[in-house]
Amino acid sequence: MFENIPNVKLGLIAVSRDCFPRTLSEMRRANIVKAAKGELYECPVTVENENDMLKAVADVQAAGCNALVVFLGNFGPETPETLIAKYFDGPCMFVAAAEGDGDLINGRGDAYCGMLNCSYNLGMR
């Protein structure tokens, strides 16, 4: 009926800085996918470096995604996470996890601070 509305297949790529637990980003990514109730493609590749970034972009492209959410489940690696936007041919939105589960030992990810660095790095690209 409405042919002028784009058909969006949204993908979710989680990123993680290697000095933080990778499982923190993966757990938080899974929680987002669960809340989205199947309306989101979950990329199984967690990006910590440039090689992971290339694998993740190839994965979401192969899955037919035409828009992305790049999710900082913890601080995140500034260069690889921002290169996702360069290599993915479509819109990318960057979001960061909130600290809120009370686990300040294994659950602290400093994603807000990572988002500040990410924003600065995106501005340089």
Residue ranges and their predicted role:
Residues 1-125:
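An N-terminal assembly and electron-transfer interface module characteristic of large anaerobic redox
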